[in-house]
Amino acid sequence: MGDEQLAKAGLFVDDFNRLRLIDPDVAELLQSAQDKSSEFNDQLKNFQTTTGGLIDSIEEFANVVETEKIRAMMVRNTQERDLAEDDPVLLQMTIRELTVEKERLRVELEAVRKIEKEQDECIQMMTEH
């Protein structure tokens, strides 16, 4: 009967017979929510670390690929130039091919930038929540 009167007054007695201002069940739920929130925060930090490492790896790989593409294009262009120096028709064809390749690379660059922007927005949204 004493516990009921204390509860009416907004006071509660826990399992250790200590006087509390919050119902022990509510306090337990709050502690559980706090623990889950902390666990989620740790998981989010782990995700950020993992995605950051992945992004760095992808950027490094992209730089290597781009370097190799440029090197291959230089070798090909050198070979084509050596062959085409004597033939103006072949020179015009090479110019057209290089123009088309340049346009394709420009479009590819735009697509990659768009994907990068979307990924940055996604990561930003995840870090804000």
Swiss-Prot record:
Residues 89-121 form a coiled coil. Its main location: other. GO terms for biological process: cilium assembly; intraciliary transport; protein localization to cilium. Keywords: Cell projection, Cilium, Coiled coil. InterPro entries: FT20. The keyword Nucleotide-binding does not apply. It comes from the Eukaryota. GO terms for cellular component: centrosome; ciliary basal body; ciliary base; cilium; cytoplasm; dendrite; intraciliary transport particle; intraciliary transport particle B. The keyword Coiled coil applies. It is found in: Cell projection, Cilium. Component of the IFT complex B composed of at least che-2, che-13, dyf-1, dyf-3, dyf-6, dyf-11, dyf-13, ift-20, ift-74, ift-81, ifta-2, osm-1, osm-5 and osm-6. Component of the intraflagellar transport (IFT) complex B required for transport of proteins in the motile cilium. Required for ciliary entrance and transport of specific ciliary cargo proteins such as che-3 which are related to motility. PANTHER family: INTRAFLAGELLAR TRANSPORT PROTEIN 20 HOMOLOG. This is Intraflagellar transport protein 20 homolog. It comes from Caenorhabditis elegans. The gene is ift-20.
